[in-house]
UniProtKB/Swiss-Prot annotation:
May be phosphorylated. Activated by hyperosmotic stress. It catalyses: L-seryl-[protein] + ATP = O-phospho-L-seryl-[protein] + ADP + H(+); L-threonyl-[protein] + ATP = O-phospho-L-threonyl-[protein] + ADP + H(+). SMART domains: S_TKc (SM00220). May play a role in signal transduction of hyperosmotic response. Induction: Weakly induced by hyperosmotic stress and abscisic acid (ABA) in leaf blades. Induced during incompatible interaction with the bacterial pathogen Xanthomonas oryzae pv. oryzicola. This is Serine/threonine-protein kinase SAPK5. Residues 350-360 have a biased composition (Basic and acidic residues). The active site is at residue 123. Disulfide bonds: none annotated. GO terms for cellular component: cytoplasm; nucleus. The lineage of its organism: Eukaryota, Viridiplantae, Streptophyta, Embryophyta, Tracheophyta. It comes from Oryza sativa subsp. japonica (Rice). ATP binds at residues 10-18, 33. Its main location: cytoplasm.
Length: 370
């Protein structure tokens, strides 16, 4: 931690606190996610780090390293100066179709790469998509806490993800294809960008999770008359919002859909994306970059190093005197209180969804999940 200095807090959630930090030597700004040592350091945290570490793509926030302090495990990542895509939507109300397509194209390319690396995200949403600070913002997928790798883990069957974005099969509590569930979540993201509202929520009763889940299961959504959405875009949404995941459009089919291909930036075309799918090609691209910083952008830590650090963070040290702050000797007790409140709210949200799921006789027959 000695090589970083704090700049300011940039976020908080049920995980803990996120801070903007500066590398004292290089002056590079990084985002650092602090998770309190002890019971919070669980399988999800280790999975997030290992999965994130393996991903090298322009539309995915770069993982840099993980370090342990007296009180926290700190995940060091690329800093996205443009903030959340969610905030941009809130400010605009909704996007014009061309702008929505611009961000959707980047989202799909990033998720498609994750799937090629055998990782499904399982919690795709606007809040987990960041933007860099460029005039034409580059979208960056973040937060791999719920992700699963088919190379390291079994097929998912837990009900994870955010209810407004969740796919019907995820509610089945049976094994499902996480990649197909990600496709559904991408569709919800596109809809929200176009309409400025969630497709399966009743805007007059947004906290009625029972109604939301019922609408998800019956694929009950509509595009308001006052929102102009072209027919090709409507067709794509209708192919994404299909209850049976095996009849749903695939990520590859989305990438060949006429609406997706319209005004597709050169760097997102298949021939330009190919280098990221070849690990050796990606390594060569990094090592041959003119900037030394680009060559060092990927984490030097091995999986074994990360496992050792995470295991260390699962224990809470008993210092001779209290350790304050996040490892640099400042008093940040107030910062620790805010996430606890948000965590309670998040727990209530998830708990309600589970209760609704348990109390409603959901018809899963149309899903045909084996």
């Amino acid at each position: 931690m000695e090589k970083y200095e704090p700049v300011r807090e940039i976020g908080a959630g049920n995980f803990g606190v996120a801070k903007l930090m500066r590398n004292k030597e290089t002056r590079e700004l990084v985002a650092m996610k602090f998770i309190e040592r002890g019971n919070r350091i669980d399988e999800n945290v280790f999975r997030e780090i290992v999965n994130h570490r393996s991903l090298r793509h322009p539309n995915i926030i770069r993982f840099k390293e993980v370090v342990v302090t007296g009180r926290h495990l700190a995940i060091v990542m690329e800093y996205a100066a443009g903030g959340e895509l969610f905030e941009r939507i809130c400010e605009a109300g909704r996007f014009h179709e061309d702008e929505a397509r611009y961000f959707f194209q980047q989202l799909v390319c990033g998720v498609s790469y994750c799937h090629a690396m055998q990782i499904c995200h399982r919690d795709l949403k606007l809040e987990n998509t960041l933007l860099d600070g460029s005039p034409a913002p580059r979208l960056k997928i973040c937060d791999f806490g719920y992700s699963k790798s088919s190379l390291l883990h079994s097929r998912p069957k837990s009900t994870v993800g955010t209810p407004a974005y969740i796919a019907p099969e995820v509610l089945s509590r049976r094994e499902y294809d996480g990649k197909l569930a990600d496709v559904w979540s991408c569709g919800v993201t596109l809809y929200v960008m176009l309409v400025g509202a969630y497709p399966f929520e009743d805007p007059k009763d947004p906290k009625n999770f029972r109604k939301t889940i019922s609408r998800i299961m019956s694929v009950q959504y509509k595009i308001p008359e006052y929102v102009h959405v072209s027919q090709p875009c409507r067709h794509l949404l209708s192919r994404i919002f299909v209850a049976n995941p095996y009849k749903r459009i695939s990520m590859g089919e989305i990438k060949s859909h006429p609406w997706f291909l319209k005004n597709l930036p050169r760097e997102l075309k298949e021939e330009a994306q190919a280098v990221y799918y070849n690990r050796r090609g990606a390594d060569h691209a990094a090592s041959s970059a003119s900037s030394a910083a680009a060559a060092a952008a990927f984490s030097p830590q091995s999986v074994e190093d990360i496992m050792r650090i995470v295991q260390e963070a699962q224990t809470v040290p008993k210092p001779d005197k209290p350790v304050s702050g996040y490892g640099w000797g400042t008093d940040d007790d107030d910062d620790d209180q805010q996430p606890a409140e948000e965590e309670d709210e998040e727990d209530d949200y998830d708990r309600t969804v589970r209760e609704v799921h348990a109390s409603v006789d959901l018809d899963m027959s149309n899903l045909q999940i084996s």
